[in-house]
Amino acid sequence: MASPSGQYIFGEFSDDEFKQFFVTARCTVELPPYNEHFFPCGPQSSVDFQDDMHLKFSEVIHGISGEECPRIEFGIEQVVDRDTALNNNTDYSISSNLNPQAPEFILTCSSFPKTSNNVLHENNFDAINCQFSESAIPDGSGNADSDGTSGTGQRERKKKKKRPPGYYSYLEGVGDVPSETLVNGHANSTGLDSISTDDPDLADDIPISTTSPRTCTSPDNFVDLINEALSDEASMHNVLDNARTAGQPEECSVTSSEQSCIPSDNGSESPVRTAVVQPFAGTDTTENLGVTNGQTLESPEEDTVSNGVVLHPEVSSFSEEVKTEETSTAQALIHLSGSASSNPPAKSWASLFHTSKPSSSPQVAYVETKNAPTVVSPQVPEKQVEIKEEPVPVSDDPVAIEFAELLEEVKLVHKPVSLQPRGLINKGNWCYINATLQALVACPPMYHLMKSIPVYTKAQRPCTSTPMIDSFVRLMNEFTNMPILPKAKQAPGEKVIKDIRPGAPFEPTYIYRLLTVFKSSLSEKGRQEDAEEYLGFILNGLHEEMLALKKLLLPQNDQIHINNCPNPVSGVEEVNKEEQEGSDEEWEQVGPRNKSSVTRQADFVQTPITDIFGGHMRSVVYQQSSKESATLQPFFTLQLDIQSEKIRTVQDALESLVARESVQGYTTKTKQEVEICRRVTLEELPPVLVLHLKRFVFEKTGGCQKLIKNIEYPVDLEVSKDLLSPGVKSKIFKGQRTYRLFAVVYHHGNSATGGHYTTDVFQIGLNGWLRIDDQSVKVINQYQVVKQTVERTAYLLYYRRVDLL
């Protein structure tokens, strides 16, 4: 086998090498250490087999020098069983893209001189069967290649000048000597060693054959390979201790009874179970045969490449002779599986792995395939379990009583809290919601109230009667405290130099869903999105949920009708209606100068929400020859009309609110027209005062326009005594009617049916102002807060009482 010139390693393979190189999906070979002694591998006992193979590898790989060679990896993608029905099939051929000129395939060291015994062993030794052949001339079995220059041969001829001597000898052969199929692009040494390829004259006389010789006498079909694998199993265990395949644990072993090759006998209706022989103990193998070296197997129409083996849909044929050992082995394997053998239709190697399933046995991997085209079912995303947010009655709420008791004992905390600001992601038209939420988060009593309510798990509270409270408790818990910095000396309007690091923005989808849970009119498509209306929706919703809980603590006989929605004073018609119908909650009140009036108050129960935002207005109707009629009406926001040209500031709008109003055309029961006057005053001021500048005016034609005018508003607002009701003027001190601005909601744009909302909030930790536009958070100075432009106008003003700061 060795010659004075450089010799190619890719010559002869033992049966275990062939399985590792061409059967296993991914193989590696660790060559054994160099051995100085040489014993020819002939028909010997299994005890000597390991030493013989040991030396054979050492001689071929190491040579005389005994130098270590690097770890070499080989592999294929698919395995095809040989069957007599595929003898003349022209669908497939095998070629190689391994480069035999690579350094790891060429022996650079000189070989030792041949002896007569060595020459005999080299010429007649069969590395696959580990035995000596009867003749140096190969037998008549072989696979013919339809085109000797096709595949890799055609590509390699383009670089013929760069190839070593004898490289193209596998394309030539003696016409009367049958040649064998190429294995990795090398000629069979048993057939070519007798012919010197170094003699150019002799090489020119050799005609080019239609078939190409192959390097080693590899099995002609897969059954032969299994037959050889089953024989001499005990010897194989010792030989393969040094040959390991990547991925298989060392303790994995294969028994002969578990290896089977079972072709289908039912045509396309039955699946084909193919046993892919795994390496014996001490080997590694990949678990997923459907993927080779990180690449998914391609469709049969495309060429498949894996570690140097290329599968082309070209003309190919198998040997016509089948050994008797192969037939007997195949029948034995079929008997073990309980399935009869038949001629399966020709299919590509890749099709065997399209529906691969893992085997229950760790030793043999089975691949089950049907001839019908594989239908890939679309991946259905996992259905996420959504928490049912539809409110249930308080009687079905397991923690309703506990919740109600907590609300009874809660005490409002007005201490400022420094929170790390976070933007809100807006993936829809939610700017009016995001702007309102940022203002509520900046309200200390609102934040402390929600933080005092515990967060219940789904197990503790499988259903809820307070989805709105739960959502706002969750919202406040999204924000974390930030240490309060020392108070900086800053004059009003001075530029803030400090910087702040906001937290990561988030999307409060649970808040957005409340609109559909309560079927609010704000969720109607195409409806005007109004920040003030949304604020009323929130405050009324929270108030009603707390009210329902508080009812649980009242005795059954004390249940009374409760007005759940504080609304602004509607008008004189409602007052007159109440006068006609009468009310149980009315009393006569003597005012200044001994003037008496009948006062009516709607039934109203306090909740923590009303304790923060709730105030009362007193509406008095003056009529000739009658006592004054007064009505107390709760409110969450003060509606300020700014349409008049005289109104330029917030103070002007407040004075206009309490101005006396005359009503024309009012008649009594006797159909007599009388003059009526109406005046509204502030009876009770809330801790948090929200002023609504009514910029959207409805026209007689039914349209709506935005009032684009600048209304000046101060940072510190003092409510004049003239705005208070006569009975409370002396009771409310200056500190209780002085407020400080902490949030402003702006409306951007000139249209009343569109636009954008942003918010400016006061940050106690920064001791300055932040401008929040959905996800954007930036520091601004106080001058930018009170300054308005045509494009951006103030819409909602949030004030806190200074005596509670």
Swiss-Prot record:
It comes from the Eukaryota. GO terms for biological process: autophagy; cellular response to interleukin-1; DNA damage response; DNA damage response, signal transduction by p53 class mediator; DNA repair; negative regulation of canonical NF-kappaB signal transduction; negative regulation of stress granule assembly; protein deubiquitination. It is found in: Cytoplasm; Nucleus. Pfam families: UCH. Residues 422-802 form the USP domain. It is an enzyme of class 3 (hydrolase). Its EC number is 3.4.19.12. Residues 136-173, 284-305, 573-600 are annotated as: Disordered. Hydrolase that can remove conjugated ubiquitin from target proteins such as p53/tp53, rps2/us5, rps3/us3, rps10/eS10, becn1, snx3 and cftr. Acts as an essential regulator of p53/tp53 stability: in unstressed cells, specifically deubiquitinates p53/tp53 in the cytoplasm, leading to counteracts MDM2 action and stabilize p53/tp53. Following DNA damage, translocates to the nucleus and deubiquitinates p53/tp53, leading to regulate the p53/TP53-dependent DNA damage response. Component of a regulatory loop that controls autophagy and p53/tp53 levels. Belongs to the peptidase C19 family. USP10 subfamily. This is Ubiquitin carboxyl-terminal hydrolase 10-B. The gene is usp10-b.
